[in-house]
Structures are given as structure tokens and as C-alpha cells.
Amino acid sequence: YLIMSVFLIGYCACDNDEENFDTATTGQVIKVPDDIKSFNSVTKEIVFEKNISIKQDVLGNEKVEFRIAGNGHFTVGSISSISSVIYNAPVLLGDYQRYYLYDGYPVVDVLQNEVRNQEERDENMQKIEKAWSNFLKVLNEAGKLK
């Protein structure tokens, strides 16, 4: 028991506040544009069709994959607005029955090192840049982009 206790204490002490979604599991697949009612490119609010339910996790262990009608896909972490962890990767934020697609969470303005966090977010968005452009294009063509 002593060895296990030391291991658990060490593991918890080494926890980093910045979350990496590479180890998360894909919990939901969203078909673009079919499963999306609208996406506001200014506020980043995304409204899903009625039958869509998104599982959220404050630790970022859930992922949502957006499959874009024959034009690729991208995956984001699905988190709740009550999360206190810094995410510098694209996220689907659930906030009281509303959802938002952000480049990270929380907004960089409230973080100590704004520049470093924004640079990391920009790098992660570049990784999905082609799929993100297709996402916006498909939604626009379907009349679902605001």
C-alpha cells in the first residue's frame, strides 16, 4: 500500500494544468452539415439539430469528431464551462445548453502568459486549417453559416 500511495501522490503532484487531447477518446461524431443547424463565425456558437447530445468532461477526456461531407475531418476536445484546466487546443465548449467552437479555453486574456498560450493555440489551429476551411465552406454552402 505504501508504494501505491507514493505513486498516486507523485502522479497527482505532476499533473499539468494544460490539457492535451491526444489521449482522449472520440465519443461523438458530428456530420457536417447534416447535424448542424447553424454556426456563428463571430461568436463561435454552434447549434446542433435536435437529436444531437454532446457528452462533456471537465478533464477533457471526451472528443468530438467533425466529419465534413467528403472533405475531411477534425477532432476537438469536448469540455464543460466549469472546467478550470487550460486547453490550448480546439475545443467544443458546453455552456448551459449552448455550445461554442473555440481555439482553446479559457480566453487568453485571463491567462498569465497570453502570448505563449495564443501561440500554442495558433499552432494547433494550423494543424486543422484545411479541415476548418472546409467546415466553414460546407456550412456556408448549406446556408448554415452566420
Model-derived regions, located:
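Intrinsic disorder and flexible/low-complexity segments
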Residues: 21-67, 76-80
